[in-house]
């Protein structure tokens, strides 16, 4: 991928002061890479992960009393606090305490002195969609949950809910912190954001042609021989396959760039290689490509990146 430690340090150097990870291992990798910023795990791991969370100072999300108590008890053994973020389910129905049950949940677990509520968050299901009805419902539920906590004297801590799309499209939900996700890598989450912010993809993937051949009509290519040559095409091989992240489901459904021209990937993508075709026929003023072994192929990105 992009390199977790490198991305984290770049984000911090650019003004971020908090980091989020998807797994405990990701958090540990950052700590071992000398990243000292606060890290929140955006899920609730198994209770057996509690010692690692505490040792590496990774704050988990909490939404079940069983994990909350196990985590707190382990912290108590060490004589330290157990910081966490409360995940609130406002409609995505993936993880979290139901929005109208947050007070009861906190009362159920807050008897344990080690627990330390550092933040409260939710996640939007439709921030990148055209309609705003469901988005508005989630915002309303989340603000009600935050208000309910405050009304009974529970400080929700850092309030955050804006993913990439919401950060760009809805500044009113920035609250105390935003979670810059896929757009951190220069990707737009929806068409609407393209006119609102200028992003440049952080990654490009290039390869070199390792073999070429001109096939007669009806000759097959790759596993299953699902692709058949229409004749007058050159088949070129590049050393990139599904083991490198080029999804096999994209077989025959994606294009590459050679010498500034789009070329069609053909045949099933192999583990470590794939092929594309180049039409050798000449149409009017269309420039005829004739790629050779060693020529550059752009898998992801633009020519010249």
Annotated model-derived regions:
Residues 41, 117, 209, 265-266:
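A structural signal for short, hydrophobic beta-strand segments that form beta-sheets
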Residues 59, 91-94, 237, 275:
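Short aromatic/hydrophobic contact patches that present stacked aromatics
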Residues 1-14, 68-82, 90-208, 212-216:
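Active-site loop/helix belt of alpha/beta enzymes
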Residues 23, 43, 124, 163, ...:
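Residues that line or immediately flank small-molecule/substrate-binding pockets and catalytic motifs
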Residues 16-17, 35-37, 56, 79-82, ...:
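Short coil/turn connectors at secondary-structure junctions
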């Amino acid at each position: 991928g992009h390199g977790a430690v490198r991305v984290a340090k770049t984000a911090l150097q650019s003004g971020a002061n908090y980091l989020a990870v998807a797994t405990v291992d990701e958090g540990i990798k950052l700590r071992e890479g000398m990243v000292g910023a606060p890290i929140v795990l955006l899920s609730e791991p198994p209770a057996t992960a509690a010692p690692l969370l505490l040792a590496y100072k990774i704050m988990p999300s909490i939404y079940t009393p069983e994990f909350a108590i196990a985590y707190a008890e382990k912290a108590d053994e060490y004589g330290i606090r157990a910081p966490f973020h409360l995940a609130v389910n406002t409609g995505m129905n993936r993880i979290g305490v139901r929005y109208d049950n947050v007070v009861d949940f906190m009362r159920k677990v807050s008897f344990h002195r080690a627990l330390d509520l550092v933040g409260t968050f939710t996640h939007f299901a439709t921030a990148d969609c055209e309609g705003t009805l469901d988005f508005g419902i989630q915002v309303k539920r989340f603000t009600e949950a935050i208000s309910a906590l405050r009304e009974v004297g529970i400080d929700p801590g850092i309030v955050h809910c804006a993913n990439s799309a919401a950060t760009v499209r809805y500044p009113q939900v920035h609250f105390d912190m935003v979670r810059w996700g896929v757009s951190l890598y220069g990707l737009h989450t929806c068409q609407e954001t393209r006119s609102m912010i200028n992003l440049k993809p952080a990654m490009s993937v290039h390869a070199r042609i390792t073999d070429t051949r001109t096939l007669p009509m009806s000759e097959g290519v790759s596993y299953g021989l699902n692709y058949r040559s229409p004749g007058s095409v050159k088949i070129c091989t590049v050393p990139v396959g599904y083991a490198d992240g080029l999804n096999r489901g994209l077989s025959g459904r994606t294009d590459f760039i050679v010498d500034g021209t789009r070329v069609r990937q053909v045949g099933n993508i192999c583990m470590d290689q794939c092929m594309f075709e180049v039409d050798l026929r000449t149409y009017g003023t269309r420039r005829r490509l004739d790629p050779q072994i060693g020529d550059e192929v752009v898998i992801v990105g633009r020519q010249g990146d």
